[in-house]
């Protein structure tokens, strides 16, 4: 059991837990990248970063008001993309410059994701990240494990 715990804890760096995502439109491969599973803390960090908080005067504390879903999804995709692919795609300064020259406002890797992935493509990538991260595993599979 101890060895199993140790191996299970390494899911974020385990290459067997990764999946290649290909962005194909009209039969043409535009680009591809590899994603990995995320831990709860990574999901939470992305959510907090893109949630607007307001101070509740009655309770004297900040409460979440609204989460920017578009930025949140892009942050999840960015976080789940392996480092090598993040550097080649989302953080590539040449890509930023070219997109800026086309009139798109690129300030960071999240902006590249927003402009380069269609809404439905982002949803599908998020689904794959969730599956890799252990969401939507059937009860039967959990019982087997």
Which positions does each model-derived feature cover?
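Short amphipathic alpha-helical surface micro-motifs
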Residues: 1-4, 12-19, 57-63, 113-114
């Amino acid at each position: 059991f101890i060895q199993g715990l140790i191996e299970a804890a390494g899911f974020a760096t385990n290459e067997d837990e990764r999946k290649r995502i290909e962005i194909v439109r009209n039969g043409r491969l535009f680009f591809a990248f590899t994603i990995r599973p995320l831990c709860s803390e990574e999901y939470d960090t992305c959510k907090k970063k893109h949630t607007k908080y307001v101070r509740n005067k009655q309770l004297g504390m900040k409460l979440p008001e609204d989460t920017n879903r578009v930025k949140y999804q892009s942050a999840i995709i960015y976080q789940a993309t392996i480092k090598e692919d993040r550097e080649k795609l989302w953080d590539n300064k040449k890509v930023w410059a070219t997109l800026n020259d086309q009139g798109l406002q690129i300030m960071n890797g999240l902006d590249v994701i927003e402009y380069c992935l269609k809404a439905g493509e982002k949803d599908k990538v998020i689904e794959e990240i969730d599956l890799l991260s252990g969401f939507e595993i059937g009860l039967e599979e959990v019982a087997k494990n």
